[in-house]
A protein has these predicted regions:
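Start-transfer (signal-anchor) and selected internal transmembrane alpha helices
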Residues: 27-66
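Periplasmic/ER-lumenal interhelical loops and adjacent helix-loop junctions
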Residues: 36-37, 80, 87, 91-101, ...
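Transmembrane alpha-helix segments characteristic
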Residues: 57, 363, 374-387
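Active-site lumenal/periplasmic loops and adjacent helix-entry segments of GT-C-fold
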Residues: 65-194, 199, 208-217, 223-229
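Transmembrane alpha-helical segments
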Residues: 144-151, 192-208, 245-246, 263-270, ...
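Transmembrane helix irregularities
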Residues: 171, 248-257, 288-292
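Short hydrophobic alpha-helices at membrane interfaces in multi-pass membrane enzymes
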Residues: 206-248, 277
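Perimembrane helix-loop-helix junctions
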Residues: 219-226, 259-287
């Protein structure tokens, strides 16, 4: 017979469970020396991020500084594919959900899915749609640098590598070309995709972290090993949900990304083994949010509805010429100079013309070198497949 009540037994088990959890925390808790070193690394990391942001913001002020007065007086950022965007949050949300396209005499058809993220952006800035578009164009460069910095941090803790990744992503020729031509959809995709990758990596438990290697033996480890060797990070369903919502934003801006995401995430789910369900969850919002649009694409496929997959928001832009194979390999959209410096004189013009090609070649060489590394070779090959 039991010598205690069921309540006493439950309390005893609870105390034992809490004691085991406390012992586990004490076993892996960093020492005072480790905490000091981690704080130093955090200061270095913050200084690196501040330097990157300072450089990018200074460049942003140089490029868009003359616009500030015009925009403050009610001006608009227009040109290329970017059209005037009048309307309030209610107008944008009504157009996104009404199922009625107002162009011409009007017709019953699903709205452009890009209106959904635009409605969220309009609500975020607290003004009209034109204010949201102006703000997005003006802060696109710092946002791209932030995206590159934090996404690189999921794979490495090196401040130098993260700084280079942030600057390369912010100075990408394709991104600058989309800004110059007013392709708002391509701009949003460039800003969102790194966060999709970061959230997807967190979803499967891949995230680099600072680990301090001290000469002393870590307490509580019978074999004298390091805590890093025995620690296994779990995936996060919340991160998978965030990746799905961010991917939905990217797909709304460029619908052609949905088949690309399927081609990338399905093999990744097969390789992930334990986290395959988590990766498949990432695809759900991208399918559900623009669902009426997919119905229109499938229903009119034989009549040319497939063109809706490659459609871009905004006015059509006529390109001067198609890029060559070498330009595509280097990530150049054809005849792209850094920040429009191709007409400048002297070293500045040379830098503007040669810089994009040199940057693309450097990224290509680093990516090729990563293929021969033994560590994380599966992830590198998967990234090449996705690219």
């Amino acid at each position: 017979p039991l010598l205690g009540t069921w309540r006493q037994v439950a309390a005893e088990r609870r105390d034992a469970r809490l004691a085991r959890a406390e012992a586990q925390r004490n076993r892996w808790a960093p020492s005072e020396l480790e905490r000091t070193e981690l704080r130093r690394l955090a200061r270095v990391r913050r200084a690196g991020l501040a330097a990157v942001l300072l450089a990018v913001v200074a460049l942003d002020v140089v490029l868009f500084g003359p616009w500030q007065g015009v925009l403050a007086d009610g001006g608009r950022v227009v040109g290329g594919a970017l059209l005037p965007a009048p309307g309030t949050l209610g107008d944008v949300w009504g157009s996104a959900t009404s199922g009625w396209v107002r162009d011409g005499l009007g017709t019953s058809a699903p709205a452009d899915p890009f209106l959904v993220p635009l409605a969220g952006l309009t609500a975020l800035v607290g003004g009209g749609l034109q204010t949201a578009v102006n703000a997005l164009v003006l802060v696109a460069l710092p946002l791209a640098a932030l995206a590159g910095w934090f996404t690189a941090g999921a794979l490495t803790r090196s401040v130098g590598v993260r700084a280079v990744a942030a600057l390369v992503w912010a100075a990408s020729p394709g991104f600058l070309a989309s800004l110059a031509s007013g392709r708002l959809g391509a701009t949003v995709v460039h800003l969102v995709l790194p966060w999709v990758l970061l959230a997807a990596l967190r979803a499967v438990g891949v995230h680099a972290r600072d680990v301090v290697d001290l000469p002393e033996v870590h307490r509580g480890l019978p074999d004298g090993g390091r805590a890093r060797a025995a620690t296994r990070r779990r995936g996060s369903l919340g991160a998978a949900g965030a990746a799905g919502l961010l991917l939905a934003v990217a797909v709304c801006a460029a619908p052609v990304l949905l088949p690309v995401a399927v081609v990338v995430l399905v093999p990744a789910a097969l390789l992930a083994r334990r986290a395959w369900r988590t990766l498949l969850v990432v695809l759900v919002p991208a399918v559900v949010v623009p669902l009426p649009y997919w119905g229109q694409v499938v229903g009119s496929w034989a009549d040319g509805g497939w063109r809706l997959l490659v459609a871009e928001p905004g006015a059509p832009v006529v390109e001067q010429g198609a890029p060559s194979g070498l330009e595509l390999l280097l990530g150049l959209p054809g005849g792209t100079a850094w920040f429009g410096l191709d007409d400048a004189d002297g070293a500045l013009g040379t830098l503007g013309r040669v810089g994009p090609a040199v940057g693309g070649a450097l990224v290509l060489l680093l990516a090729a070198a990563a293929l021969v590394r033994r560590r994380a070779v599966r992830g590198v090959r998967l990234a090449w497949f996705g690219a």
